[in-house]
């Protein structure tokens, strides 16, 4: 089935391995971004995955386009223009040293995208699903207007709409995020959040949850998910739960609430030894979209999403380069890491 994702792909610059910034002269270049990561995952799962963005017409934009094509993503509706591609510097943490991300994305091409620039009726035609994240409207009021246009076109075409709230405090305040995001989220088919997004972006508190303790009670999220579902007319609400014991060791799980039935699903819990956690939430979103779009029972879809994301934590870079079959093998208990011959 055809899927469409809209957002900003960025140039990622990282020190080798677990080095500090400029510990050695080299920085490894790759590409990534919340919605692009979802598009890549969906392509690897076998979807007809389309991505919409604005890339500068220079060699860096060309390289980003080649990367998306190489991962199986359709880029027919990518626009060219703008002055620059956003950059982020990512230092991978280890043990008690946290990972660090520094953004250099002001005045990036996507932030200059104005309403009316994209023919959304053409882009969405034939699609079964449209996905966006809260990062894109945080880049500016003009591109936030583009998100609104895309949502309207998706609904008019009968496509499901999902949003990963993805709050970035380096981009905007909670007050500004809530002012912009609350109307955009209204009526979504699926809202995805992490442990803190519901409060920051929608103003919905999670009572009894303390993300600083390193242990989370999944059941504490049921009431908050139900509040989001009913207040914003959302069919399903999913939350990823990261129990961070150190930068290297996390426990990872998720929950899913269904408004119509009131069912609250909890996934299995995975112990992770982290190689790269960037893109973990995006791989969860892609897994959930893929399974729900294919008609999987919600509990099964949640399990697939968490397993897909668990595998992503073992892969350097933003992209989750795993197949649906690999995810299902992990779901079926093949998590030993033994060589596959």
Role assignments for model-derived ranges:
Residues 153-160, 232-235:
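A short helix->loop->beta-strand "cap" motif at the edges of active sites that frequently abuts
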Residues 1-20:
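Positively charged, low-complexity intrinsically disordered leader regions
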Residues 34-44, 147-153:
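Histidine-anchored nucleotide/phosphate-binding helix
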Residues 30, 38-48, 291-294:
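Alpha-helix C-terminal capping segments
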Residues 171-260:
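Conserved phosphate/ATP/ADP-binding segment of small-molecule kinases
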């Amino acid at each position: 089935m055809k899927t469409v994702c809209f957002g900003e792909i960025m140039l990622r610059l990282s020190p080798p391995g677990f080095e500090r910034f400029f510990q050695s002269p080299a920085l490894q270049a790759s590409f990534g971004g919340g919605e692009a990561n979802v598009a890549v995952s969906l392509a690897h799962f076998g979807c007809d995955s389309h991505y919409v963005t604005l890339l500068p017409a220079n060699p860096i934009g060309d390289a980003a386009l080649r990367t998306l094509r190489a991962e199986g993503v359709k880029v027919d509706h990518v626009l060219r223009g703008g002055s620059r591609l956003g950059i982020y510097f990512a230092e991978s943490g280890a043990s008690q040293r946290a990972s660090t991300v520094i953004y250099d994305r002001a005045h990036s091409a996507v932030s200059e995208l104005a309403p009316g620039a994209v023919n959304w009726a053409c882009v969405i035609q034939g699609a079964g699903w449209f996905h966006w994240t809260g990062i894109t409207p945080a880049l500016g009021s003009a591109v936030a207007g583009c998100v609104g246009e895309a949502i309207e076109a998706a609904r008019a075409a009968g496509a499901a709409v999902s949003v990963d709230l993805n709050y970035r405090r380096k981009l905007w305040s909670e007050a500004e995020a809530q002012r912009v995001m609350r109307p955009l989220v209204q009526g979504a088919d699926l809202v995805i959040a992490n442990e803190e997004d519901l409060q920051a972006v929608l103003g919905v508190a999670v009572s009894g949850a303390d993300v600083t303790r390193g242990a989370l009670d999944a059941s504490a999220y049921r009431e908050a998910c139900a509040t989001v579902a009913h207040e914003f007319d959302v069919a399903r609400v999913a939350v990823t739960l990261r129990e961070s014991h150190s930068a290297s060791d996390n426990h990872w799980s998720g929950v899913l609430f269904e408004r119509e039935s009131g069912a609250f699903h909890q996934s299995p819990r995975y112990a992770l030894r982290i190689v790269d956690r960037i893109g973990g939430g995006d791989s969860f979103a892609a897994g959930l979209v893929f399974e729900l779009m294919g008609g999987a029972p919600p509990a099964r879809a949640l399990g697939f999403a968490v397993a897909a994301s668990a595998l992503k934590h073992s892969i350097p870079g933003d992209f989750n380069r795993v197949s649906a079959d690999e995810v299902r093998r992990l779901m079926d208990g093949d998590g030993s890491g033994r060589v596959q011959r």
